[in-house]
A protein has these predicted regions:
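An amphipathic, hydrophobic-aromatic interaction surface with interspersed Lys/Arg
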Residues: 1-262
Length: 262
């Protein structure tokens, strides 16, 4: 984060404002991130974006190209979407809560559902797939996506009604939904760093294309991956489903790495 001082004149009087300006994606506030999402969706021109992003006073509503250029330089990092992020910038939408940092609290089965919906959306660009992804990703406190087959104690949680929640998510602001999608792309890039064999990344992607809907996701069958993970240990299938997703990723990543060495 850096401090920016803007000096200007109004009616012959000198004025100045000081703003704290982020230097990287992880320093964006929720409000700033939503503005970036609007810009990426083509809903804001450069002048309006800068006006709102820097919270410029109304006297600077019509900034000239020179001023606009220098403001743009302060946030030029926003041009490059090749970002790795382990958390969600938007922590909640109403009563729906995002996973905490590093996907803590998400089990392997839950992640497979989320990522399958994400891959479908990226390939087919159907809003219904994005709505389903967000419905699975942002859930209420106490909700679970996959019930244990044989719970050892009374459940304090209740099962998510995915169909009902998807219909509710469909009514959210499209900008919010796009911001969540973009953030999840950043999460996937973090996973590619932490688990490079399980989540291989094509670094040849153009920096302005990463995160855009037209980028095609590879065909990933999490069902096949899960079957290979479980193998002949069918009796322990539930254990694998309920395993923290990052624990499963670590085991799978090691298996793939070891197999490639042979």
């Amino acid at each position: 984060m850096k401090q920016l001082r803007l000096d200007y004149r109004v009616m012959g009087c000198s004025r100045s404002i000081i703003r704290q300006v982020p230097e990287r994606w992880t320093e964006l506030t929720q409000e700033q991130f939503l503005l970036v999402a609007q810009m990426y969706r083509g809903e804001l021109d450069d002048s309006t974006f800068l006006q709102r992003f820097f919270r410029l006073p109304k006297q600077l509503k019509n900034i000239d190209e020179f001023f606009q250029y220098h403001l743009s330089e302060q946030v030029e990092f926003l041009v490059d979407c090749r970002v790795r992020m382990d958390h969600f910038i938007i922590p909640s939408v109403g009563k729906l809560q995002a996973p905490v940092a590093r996907l803590k609290g998400i089990n392997f089965a839950h992640f497979m559902f989320i990522d399958t919906a994400f891959n479908h959306y990226v390939r087919n660009e159907r809003d219904a797939d994005l709505d389903r992804m967000i419905a699975l990703l942002y859930i209420k406190q106490g909700e679970i996506v996959v019930l244990p087959d044989n719970p050892t104690k009374p459940l304090s949680s209740h099962l998510l009604d995915v169909r009902k929640r998807t219909a509710e998510v469909a009514k959210l602001d499209p900008v919010v939904k796009y911001a969540i999608f973009l953030n999840y792309v950043f999460i996937k890039r973090w996973l590619s760093k932490a688990f490079p064999f399980l989540f291989p990344l094509d670094e040849s992607d153009d920096k302005e294309e990463v995160g855009k809907k037209k980028t095609k996701a590879p065909l990933v069958s999490w069902l096949d991956i899960f079957d290979a993970f479980v193998g002949d240990d069918i009796a322990q299938m539930e254990k694998y489903q309920q395993m923290p997703c990052t624990t499963a990723f670590r085991l799978l990543d090691k298996r793939i790495r070891d197999a490639q060495k042979k």
